[in-house]
């Protein structure tokens, strides 16, 4: 009740923040005259001066006004661009670790230079994160002259980069790269076998461009470095033949069955479930195909893997559609990002779903993989000391940014007021009526000579619209994931008079549609253009620009609402940049996915009450509200999925931190002899306690078992029974001391034979190898636990609490196994005095052989489904997998680990 009044009196939180920052803007502006008077050399010298002042105890906040003034003046001299006052506010927002929401065309890239320059002065490095390699290179090369003028170095990281080049890029003051590459390099660093192999420094400050895309849309995608597992391609092919014989079970809303079948589909949660008839039918078919023994159930423990394959096949056929969720290109299934409309090369669906789609499309089925290292973007980016971001659409997700990342959203005022007109949605009964109305709207705009952008949610819809326009004889361009190579060319001229562009969400982000077309693209198309040619192109563009403005600017037509309001706002944002005129209109029908699944009943009843006829549309605020309510419902569900993913990954993340800290300490240590001594004592104590319970009577001791365990774990045969027979005073405590002494003596002899330095190096390599192998299998076990844990709910237990409890128990076992297996390998290695180089090489070779022979296996069955809120067949971003093959690698061939080094300079050193 009092909230509106208080807001009127004191302003919103955002307005108060802007007011606070405007005071600092005044101080920055006061420096401008002084900066203009400096020579280039003096202006450049300011960077060294700032670094010196930092070293003497000043803070970045104290330097901010003068540093921003320096960056602004450098921008004028080098780029010919001066930061507006609102851009200074954006720079302060980023420096303070917040998200700056800025409209299209407000110069986000230029805003970033302010915070990046200031924070790079600390010498700890700044990462500028983009959504793809193209944008990373474009922005880095665009801003490089500015940073280098100010005496700062710039690096770019990318996939398949030579290690030396990548290391230099990370050592630079400012490093550009994609979210995927930064995340994968973090994982690779934690698989390195020496400090020299690592790339990244301390994670200091990151500025994320299109922050909502990376921290929200990508949050459900785990980053996984994987190696190959067993080949199950034949099974996928067999299952794929059976799936089409299953039919869908359909019920009306009133519960009346209209079609008996074997499975049901829940479009809201994207789930497909076999019913009782379906289970019986598929079991019969599997038995006939020889995949299931006669009379056996799919739910038998040893058949759960088969059931997973059946569900993967069902989802592939019933939930994933070609040209909607994926396309087939060059014999591969390429997933389409629902938020950007772009393909995602290198990304695969998990739980066998990607292989099932490959089988459905009759493609070569790639082998399944085993996780070697993994994390999520949520947990990776929370490792940075300070995090900030920029986007055109963040305010709708402000709660999620705050609750998960601790990031506040600041809406930056535009430099010029928005002149775009956003019309109410038009809702039709059928899709055909909707498309007819869109064609009519296009024709009307084309008569005026206005450029038109038609946004579609899928490739399928964009191609359908294209076919309709061809029938009408209307010239147009199509931009979707199939024709992405023409993207720059199409977007460059999408604002020309009378231009018509049909595009998926690709046109919604990272693009700037200039009214009248892009004159710079025209100049770039010429070979060695003269000054006269450039002047003529500019003059022609100015005429076209004015012509488009007079006709009303770019008209954006959307063929349906997206699940997320952000994506809709991004599409609208293509029009009306920097105060230009423009308009937008959404056309919907009751047959659209969002309307059909989430909003149709209420709207359909409302339309019936109005007595709507074919071809009529409804334009009413109630309908728009109902649609936005449906969108909020979907957004809320997706937020719950991301939050749940984070809650589960937080458990794994704490374990990841412990293992990676242990690993980094190992790499940094010159000598781990004391660690091995400690391990040996702990393993021996545990082994003895297993056979001689503390404070037990000698009659309860399992002496034979202890002798066997010592022979197995420590490679030493000791006559313990004989000692006990000969010495009546050999009690438990004295026996422990005697055994430790004997084992230590045996290992000391090994040190003397091998040479202390060689054995110390060998110990480190063995411990790293054992840790990596056991961690890999632990990840696999955790994955299986995660996918099956929801079943505990049927036993009235909290799945999350059960997951935490069991994962903690598994982690304790992992830590004990690392100690035990390390000691076992070291104890079994036989050494003799050799030439030092040969000796070290042989020791490492034996270590490799022993470690590879050890079976670090966990008995586990793949889970059936994740919890109701979790995403079925979640995507995983897969790095160039460090696949370890059995065949011998040549010394000059690339190493199997994916580091980019030659084998002889990488893992070949320890083999």
Swiss-Prot record:
Role description: Part of the Sec protein translocase complex. Interacts with the SecYEG preprotein conducting channel. Has a central role in coupling the hydrolysis of ATP to the transfer of proteins into and across the cell membrane, serving both as a receptor for the preprotein-SecB complex and as an ATP-driven molecular motor driving the stepwise translocation of polypeptide chains across the membrane.
Cofactor note text: May bind 1 zinc ion per subunit.
Protein name: Protein translocase subunit SecA
Family: Belongs to the SecA family.
Keyword Nucleotide-binding: yes
Membrane topology: Peripheral membrane protein
Predominant location category: membrane
InterPro entries xref list: Helicase_ATP-bd, Helicase_C-like, P-loop_NTPase, SEC_C_motif, SecA, SecA_DEAD, SecA_motor_DEAD, SecA_preprotein_X-link_dom
Domain of life per record: Bacteria
Region (Disordered): 861-893
Keywords: ATP-binding, Cell inner membrane, Cell membrane, Cytoplasm, Membrane, Metal-binding, Nucleotide-binding, Protein transport, Translocase, Translocation, Transport, Zinc
Cellular component, GO annotation: cell envelope Sec protein transport complex; cytosol; plasma membrane
NCBIfam families linked: PRK12904.1, secA
Binding site for Zn(2+): 895, 897, 906-907
Subcellular location: Cell inner membrane; Cytoplasm
Sites where the protein binds ATP: 87, 105-109, 512
A GO biological-process term: protein targeting
Oligomeric and partner information: Monomer and homodimer. Part of the essential Sec protein translocation apparatus which comprises SecA, SecYEG and auxiliary proteins SecDF-YajC and YidC.
Keyword Cytoplasm applies: yes
Reaction(s) the record says it catalyses: ATP + H2O + cellular proteinSide 1 = ADP + phosphate + cellular proteinSide 2
Gene giving rise to this polypeptide: secA
UniProt EC number: 7.4.2.8
Cofactor(s) this protein requires: Zn(2+)
MF (Gene Ontology): ATP binding; metal ion binding; protein-exporting ATPase activity
